[in-house]
C-alpha cells in the first residue's frame, strides 16, 4: 500500500512539473533593465510571483538608493563627518559585507567610490587627460577604512566630510539575491532574476534541463564562445567595450580604480560565477580593476568562485576550475 501511494505521489509530481511553463517579464527597475523569469503553472500564478519579485526589488532600491533623499543611504551620506546614522540591520550588514569585499580585493572594490570627483568623461567629449594632481585629488575622500560601523548601536558613520557611499557595483546583485530568496520561500521552484546582466538562477527548466548562460566576446557580440550551465548560482559580467577613451595609444575603460582615480585598462570583460549575485557583482568589478594576473590569482583562492576574463586584445583567460565548452 505504501509503495502504491509513493508511486501515485511521484506520478502526480511528475505531471505537475511537466504542466509548468516558463514565464518572463521585462521592465525597468533601479534605473536598469530587469528580466524576471519564473516557472509556474499558469500566467496568473506567474504574475503573482513576478509581482512579489518586483516589490522586493523596489524595497531594496528604497533602502540603498543614493538618489532618494529620504533613503537611509542618503542620510548616511548627508551626515558624513558629522554624526553616526542609525540604520536597519539589513543595510548595516550589506555595508559590512561590502567592507569585507574591499579587504578581500585590496580596495579594488569600494562602496565609498561615490565620493570620487567626476573628472573623467567617456562620451567622446574628453580630449585632454586630467593632470596627475587632479586625478589624485579626485579620490581623496575615497577609502572604505573611513566607514565606521557600530553593530551594537546599529549605526554607520563616514569619517570625512563630503564622503559618500553608493551601491552601484553591488546593489543590483543584492536585489537579485533577495528577489530570488523571496520567490523560493513562496514556492517558486525555478527561475532567473536578470538584473541588467547580473543573472541569478535556481532550479531547472520544466523539461528538466539546466539554465544556460552564453558568454560572448564584446569585440564580436554575435560570436558566442562558451555556453555554461548555471543551476543554482549567479553570473555577472562587468565591462562595456563601447565606453572608453584613448590617450597616448592606451585604452582606458569607464571603470575607475577607486584607489588611484585612474580608469582601468587591459581588460574589456570580466565574468564571475558565484553562489550569490551580490558577491559575483562586486568581484566582477574588482577583477576588472585588479587586472588579469592579480584578478585570476585572487579568484583562484576563493572557493566556489570562477571567472572568465577577456583582455583588450581579445585573449581569453579563465580560472582554474572552470570548463569552457
Describe the predicted segments one by one.
Residues 2-10:
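Sec-dependent signal peptide recognition
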Residues 4-5, 18-325:
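Mature catalytic core of soluble alpha/beta enzymes
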Amino acid at each position: 500500500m505504501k509503495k502504491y501511494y509513493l508511486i501515485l505521489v511521484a506520478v502526480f509530481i511528475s505531471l505537475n512539473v511537466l504542466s509548468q511553463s516558463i514565464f518572463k517579464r521585462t521592465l525597468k527597475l533601479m534605473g536598469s533593465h530587469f528580466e524576471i523569469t519564473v516557472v509556474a503553472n499558469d500566467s496568473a500564478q506567474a504574475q503573482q510571483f513576478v509581482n512579489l519579485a518586483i516589490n522586493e526589488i523596489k524595497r531594496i532600491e528604497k533602502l540603498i538608493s543614493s538618489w532618494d533623499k529620504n533613503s537611509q543611504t542618503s542620510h548616511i551620506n548627508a551626515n558624513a563627518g558629522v554624526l553616526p546614522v542609525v540604520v536597519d540591520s539589513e543595510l548595516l550588514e550589506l555595508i559590512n559585507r561590502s567592507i569585507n569585499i574591499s579587504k578581500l580585493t585590496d580596495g579594488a572594490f569600494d562602496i565609498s567610490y561615490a565620493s570620487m570627483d567626476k573628472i573623467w568623461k567617456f562620451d567622446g567629449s574628453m580630449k585632454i587627460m586630467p593632470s596627475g594632481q587632479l586625478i589624485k585629488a579626485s579620490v581623496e575622500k575615497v577609502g572604505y577604512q573611513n566607514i565606521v560601523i557600530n553593530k551594537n548601536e546599529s549605526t554607520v558613520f563616514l569619517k570625512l566630510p563630503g564622503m559618500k557611499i553608493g551601491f552601484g557595483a553591488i546593489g543590483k546583485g543584492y536585489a537579485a539575491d533577495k528577489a530570488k530568496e523571496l520567490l523560493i520561500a513562496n514556492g517558486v521552484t525555478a527561475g532567473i532574476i536578470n538584473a541588467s546582466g547580473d543573472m541569478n538562477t535556481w532550479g531547472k527548466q520544466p523539461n528538466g534541463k539546466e539554465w544556460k548562460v552564453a558568454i560572448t566576446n564584446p569585440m564580436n557580440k554575435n560570436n558566442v564562445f562558451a555556453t555554461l550551465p548555471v543551476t543554482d548560482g549567479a553570473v555577472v559580467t562587468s565591462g562595456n567595450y563601447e565606453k572608453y577613451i584613448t590617450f597616448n595609444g592606451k585604452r582606458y575603460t569607464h571603470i575607475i580604480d577607486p584607489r588611484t582615480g585612474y580608469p582601468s585598462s587591459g581588460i574589456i570583460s570580466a565574468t564571475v560565477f558565484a553562489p550569490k549575485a551580490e558577491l559575483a557583482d562586486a568581484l566582477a568589478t574588482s577583477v576588472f580593476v585588479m587586472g588579469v594576473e592579480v584578478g585570476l590569482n585572487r579568484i583562484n583562492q576563493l572557493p566556489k568562485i570562477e571567472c572568465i576574463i577577456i583582455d583588450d586584445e581579445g585573449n581569453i583567460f579563465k580560472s582554474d576550475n572552470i570548463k569552457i565548452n
